[in-house]
Every structure is written in C-alpha cells, then in structure tokens.
Amino acid sequence: MRRDWQNFLMACGIKNFDDSELNPLDITIAVYENEEIIGTGSIAGDVIKYVAVQETTMSGHSTLFNQLMTKLENFMAVEGRFHQFVLRNQFTKKVLNTLASKRWLSVNKEFCWKKDYQILRNTCQQFPSQTPIDKVASVVINANPFTNGHRFLIEEASRNNELVYVFVLNQEASLFHTDERIALVKAGVQDLSNVIVVNGGAYIISYLTFPAYFLKHNDSAIDYQTTIDVRLFKYKIASALGITSRYVGSEPLSHTTNLYNQKLISELNPQIEVHVIQRKLAAGDLGVISARTVREAIDKGDEAVWQKMVTETTQHFISNNLLELQQRIRKGQKINGN
C-alpha cells in the first residue's frame, strides 16, 4: 500500500520521501477508484502535505481536491489545530492558485496558511473602539516579565502618538502566565492615558509558536512565521484599528530578533512606519535590560539584579510570588528565549 501511495505521488511530481518527512505524519487519507489511488493527502502537526489528485480525473478535479482538503482540515480542527498550513508541491502550486484561494494566505513559495477572517474579525471587535485618529501606534510584547525596557518602548510610542495599542502575546509557554503578564503590563503603564493594553489573542503571533521542526533552518522558521504575523497584522488588524506605526526594541544580542525586525521593516513600510528603538541600559554594569536576565535572576534569587531591570509594580509581583515562580522553573518551565 505504501509503495502504491509513493508511486502515485511520484507520478504527480512529489518525490521527497525522506524519513524526516514521513516519520512526523499523523494521518494519511486516500481516495480509490477501481482499486487505484486517485487522490491523497496527509497531516503532520499543523501542516497539510503530500496532497495530490490524479490529473486524468479533471472533470471532478476541483471537487475531489476540495473534498480531500475539507477532510484534512476537519481532522485538524477536531484535534484543536486551527492554525493550518499547506506545504506547496508540484500539484498544489497549480491548484491553490485557482481553487479555494480565498481561504489561503500565501506565505512564500513553500507554504500557504489557512485564513479564518471571521475569528480574526471577532478578535478585533473585542478591542476597545476609538474614534478615527491620525496617529495610532502599536507595540507587541511578550512581557515575560514586564521590564523597564518595555516601559521605555511604550513611553516612546505614547509621546509621539495620539493612541497606542499594546498587544501582549497570548501563549502559555512562559514563566509568567498570560493573565499575569497582561496584569503586569496594565499596572506598569496605568499612568499613560493614551495606552490601551489588550490580549493579542491567536492572531498576534510569536514566531516561537511556529512548528519549526518542519523547517530546515531556524532562520527559515523566523522568516515564515514573521511573514504570517506581519501580513495578518498589516492587512487585517492594523487596517481595522487604524494603526499607522509599530514600535520595536533593538536587540544587539539576539540574531533571531534582528531578523524579525528586518522582516517587519521590509513588509510594513511605508504604509505602517516601523520605529526601532535602541534598548535601554540597566543601572550599573548589567548591560541592556533583558527579560531573560530577569528570569535568570529569579531562578537564582538575585533580587539586586531584577530590581535594576523591572518596574516597581513588577518588583512587587516577583517578591510576592518568588517561591511560586521558582517552583515553576524547578518543574521544568524554560526560562531561555526572548
């Protein structure tokens, strides 16, 4: 059966059957006619791949393709995988341009991402509405935890714009939980009357959430994820909220963040101006303020370090919850990363 499957795909121009591609497959479905495969598709994590339909069935070509894609998408939805990608191949390169194109956002020459703009519209509608304003800035942060550096970045945006949206990433992969991070950001900017702090939801996406094990290089993972993030932000979120600029912090120590910032600049400018703000230095000889350094200090119980890097409100939270935070680390919570 596997040999027949591979032979069918090879006849459709798909020839990569390395173990690294096959081993992650969760499910493969096939459509038969007269005991011969006429269509197939597979799923690996969040990626739909190995999709092909027999060219000789052109009369039912679009119907069969859409049936396959619907079955695969439904399977992923049942599994809770709503951020769905399709890996382009010799077949899908042709078909996705003509069929179901309204459902898919082109990321690059290798990947498409499934659109669900109704969910995205619902997300935007939950944000506080404002009357039309000329200068609306945006800041996207993880705030793990909220530092003086984050505060400095938001202050810059606040001084130079009439309104600032601060999107806090919604991913439970951090030492500080999402509700804690949002609360810390709100407490840290409560004196800035033109700043609105919101949960970024599912569509303000960190590149860390991308299934990088499907990609060959880390730089590629950053590029793919940032492209999705930026294009959704530019064409759907920013347009809905009237956002005219985005503020990001420079990262002299992080190759990945530098790549991320470069992608933002190339994709957003000139319609949405990207401001790269130089990182704020900590007091003493600690160098640039870094949330990672704060997390490492929490792990070591080094209060002198985190006090120089975080706001007073964040200091109080860490002091009151130090044992709980350290316990999370002892249980395996990773503290590296951005």
Curated annotation (Swiss-Prot):
It is an enzyme of class 6 (ligase). It catalyses: holo-[citrate lyase ACP] + acetate + ATP = acetyl-[citrate lyase ACP] + AMP + diphosphate. Its EC number is 6.2.1.22. Pfam families: Citrate_ly_lig. SMART domains: Citrate_ly_lig (SM00764). One of its GO terms (molecular function) is ATP binding. Keywords: ATP-binding, Ligase, Nucleotide-binding. One of its GO terms (biological process) is biosynthetic process. PANTHER family: [CITRATE [PRO-3S]-LYASE] LIGASE. Acetylation of prosthetic group (2-(5''-phosphoribosyl)-3'-dephosphocoenzyme-A) of the gamma subunit of citrate lyase. This is [Citrate [pro-3S]-lyase] ligase. It comes from Leuconostoc mesenteroides subsp. cremoris.
